[in-house]
């Protein structure tokens, strides 16, 4: 084994351990915050947020906005730049302490109910410390690039216990590579990270979804609605980029973020599904039990409210992921379109439409169809039974995003 190969092997092991510890720390910090804020000692955030009073929802979210605003204001006082994971993969320095500050603030506000995802935090921390390890080991520029990307992917895998998704995310989004030199570290780091963060046994799925059954109705739905879901996911990605570029990084943060979180809290006082990173909203759409009662109007209300609170949080100065919000919005679109479809052509449950919507929308919003589909499968521990309609929907969504991207150039 050459010197470079030995160094890459050592970096792979170190990165898996780093990402696993980062994921473990983020999990425990989030659970501790949610226990304090929402009396959440088990179950889901939706159940916990629904159980507390509407006034408490408003107060907790407003507190989250105030704490987040102060933390980010202090972080940006001397340096307003934030190094993204993609930039770090390409070689831009990512100071570990600054990345940790930024990441822990994200975990804090998400724990207090912020309407953004928590997945960016472990990706940033793991990437930053993996880059430091790569520099310490003297890796070549290309091997360093691989290791930083693996750190980010393994961090994602560790915090959600999704080893396959973490590896595919690394290869499809960050490295855009299928070379053996990249594939082996991507899978090894994700596996090691999940082993450290959650152990040998898999925890309960992130979303509780009933067993999904295939049907001709669902297959035709996937084939026809896929392009629409893709266009919506593409539009979501463009809108997030525009809104994110406009968020304040100066004293205005101290005003805009608490005000935005207050608005989110007021919405949550009536609709607790908007609380948190999107799990509650998506779970509402996956639950088939409400379909016979509230039906289409309620599904549309949850979809609209989650869209509003996510964009409001980002525009006001909040930082965080959009992966789980995208799952929530995709599931909502699938449910909203699927309910009237099921009335006209019975044979499929709401959860199946929501699953297809989430996979197609997420893949389009990330410009990563493989990652999007595998993420939703691992998040729900469902999907193999309806792979044909899901793949048709993802394929149609990918075709739509490709066409829209070319037109936008």
Over which residues does each language-model region extend?
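Alpha-helical transmembrane segments and immediately membrane-proximal extracytoplasmic
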Residues: 1-409
């Amino acid at each position: 084994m050459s010197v470079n190969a030995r160094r890459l092997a050592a970096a792979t092991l170190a990165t898996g351990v780093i990402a696993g510890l980062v994921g473990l720390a983020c999990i425990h910090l989030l659970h501790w915050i949610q226990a304090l804020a929402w009396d959440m000692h088990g179950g889901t955030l939706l159940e916990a947020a629904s159980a507390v009073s509407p006034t408490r929802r408003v107060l907790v979210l407003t507190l989250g906005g105030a704490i987040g605003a102060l933390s980010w204001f202090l972080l940006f006082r001397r340096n307003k730049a934030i190094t993204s994971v993609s930039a770090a993969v390409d070689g831009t320095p990512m100071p570990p302490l600054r990345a940790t500050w930024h990441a822990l603030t994200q975990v804090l506000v998400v724990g207090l109910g912020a309407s953004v995802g928590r997945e960016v935090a472990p990706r940033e921390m793991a990437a930053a410390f993996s880059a430091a390890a790569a520099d310490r080991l003297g890796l070549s520029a290309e091997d360093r690039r691989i290791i930083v990307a693996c750190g980010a992917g393994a961090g994602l895998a560790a915090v959600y216990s999704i080893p396959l998704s973490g590896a595919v995310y690394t290869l499809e989004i960050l490295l855009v590579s299928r070379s053996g030199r990249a594939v082996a570290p991507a899978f090894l780091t994700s596996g090691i990270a999940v082993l450290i963060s959650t152990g040998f046994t898999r925890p309960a799925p992130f979303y509780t979804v009933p067993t999904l059954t295939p049907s001709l109705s669902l297959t035709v739905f996937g084939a026809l609605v896929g392009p629409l879901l893709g266009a919506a996911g593409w539009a979501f990605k463009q809108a997030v980029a525009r809104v994110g570029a406009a968020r304040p990084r100066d004293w205005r943060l101290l005003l805009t973020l608490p005000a935005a979180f207050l608005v989110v809290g007021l919405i949550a006082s009536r609709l607790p599904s908007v609380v948190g990173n999107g799990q509650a909203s998506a779970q509402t759409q996956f639950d088939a039990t409400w379909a016979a009662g509230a039906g289409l109007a309620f599904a549309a209300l949850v979809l609209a409210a989650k869209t509003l609170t996510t964009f409001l949080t980002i525009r006001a100065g909040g930082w965080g992921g959009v992966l789980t919000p995208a799952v929530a919005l995709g599931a909502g679109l699938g449910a909203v379109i699927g309910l009237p479809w099921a009335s006209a052509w019975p044979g499929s449950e709401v959860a199946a439409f929501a699953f297809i919507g989430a996979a197609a929308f997420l893949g389009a919003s990330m410009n990563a169809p493989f990652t999007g589909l595998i993420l939703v499968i691992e998040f729900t521990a469902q999907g193999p039974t309806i792979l044909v309609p899901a793949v048709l929907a993802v394929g149609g969504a990918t075709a739509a995003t490709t066409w829209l991207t070319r037109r936008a150039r």
